[in-house]
């Protein structure tokens, strides 16, 4: 959520900054907010005046009664005054609801470093690590490898649940679990994160706090009749752990690493990378979430990207980093980097992690603040998160990049201690 004061003081600047954001967003609502805010402030001034008058007259009534004067007309006037105040209060509540409705649907303002552009083709590559894997034979796609090695069962996943669900079997299940353990160990013992195991269901306030609601409700799995949502990412429960709290500045930054299953309907994605493990309705992920002071947030973002990179480097998987352009930035981020792993079956890099600085956008929605000392006025914190990284896509990348001509798959050195085998065959 944006700062209403900033909108009030600089509406034209806000409209300009949001005009090429790439969201389905009409900047004209900024003018509506300014108009409503001005009306509300005028009403509040008037109400204060009326309440002052009512208090003054109310204090005089006992004196007039004691003096034997008739106060009938004065009492009638006070009742009318009370009705007037009540009507004003009703209008203020209506304005508040409308402003909140609009504010919850306004995307974040891009950082000046965000490149111009409309689609993912306009994202800017800033780094490459490793070289795309070369083969002396025709490599298989991970869905074929998984089927041939009897470690991924897409057919039975579809039978049990439907399209875009997968059953992991034998060494496939162990590979998934080994990667999870490796990521969590790396982030907690080397990168300084505290491990969190969060709930997989959250309430509407939590989904609103991190920005999934109201805009992306159609992409969420909702549990009917009780208001719960299955989490699309551990970012939601971990960020909302601190909702409506004022944190002490001396404990910042807070760094959490959370493994969870993630659930996404991904409406409108039919036909886009839906074969194999790349785009599933249910998948596992290790999420990195940070809470820090505003002046530290961009340095923390750089470190967050490095932490996400570290697990891919440990696995020896080639990747690149792109800075996301304005049109592809999404709703909540002020600045975002995608890490894309090389996927031979696609002959291109595929997103495996997004690392974002939301600045105070989520903190305003979730009301998360901090203060340096107990005497200081609380200020909104900055939140960041990044995939550290998506597990299913890592499984796919390992299978494809480490496959051998005989159809076996070598296990990366970093996870052999978890796998207890050198090859899947």
UniProtKB/Swiss-Prot annotation:
Q: In which pathway does it act?
A: Aminoacyl-tRNA biosynthesis; selenocysteinyl-tRNA(Sec) biosynthesis; L-seryl-tRNA(Sec) from L-serine and tRNA(Sec): step 1/1
What is the protein name for this chain? Serine--tRNA ligase
- Main role? Catalyzes the attachment of serine to tRNA(Ser). Is also able to aminoacylate tRNA(Sec) with serine, to form the misacylated tRNA L-seryl-tRNA(Sec), which will be further converted into selenocysteinyl-tRNA(Sec).
Its assembly, as annotated, is: Homodimer. The tRNA molecule binds across the dimer.
EC class: ligase
A single Gene Ontology CC annotation of this entry is: cytoplasm
The alphabetized list of GO BP terms reads: selenocysteine biosynthetic process; seryl-tRNA aminoacylation
**UniProt-listed HAMAP family:** Ser_tRNA_synth_type1
Native source organism of the sequence: Clostridium botulinum (strain Alaska E43 / Type E3)
Subcellular compartments: Cytoplasm
Q: Which reaction does it catalyse?
A: tRNA(Ser) + L-serine + ATP = L-seryl-tRNA(Ser) + AMP + diphosphate + H(+); tRNA(Sec) + L-serine + ATP = L-seryl-tRNA(Sec) + AMP + diphosphate + H(+)
Q: Which GO terms describe its molecular function?
A: ATP binding; catalytic activity, acting on a protein; serine-tRNA ligase activity; transferase activity
Q: Which residues cross the membrane?
A: none
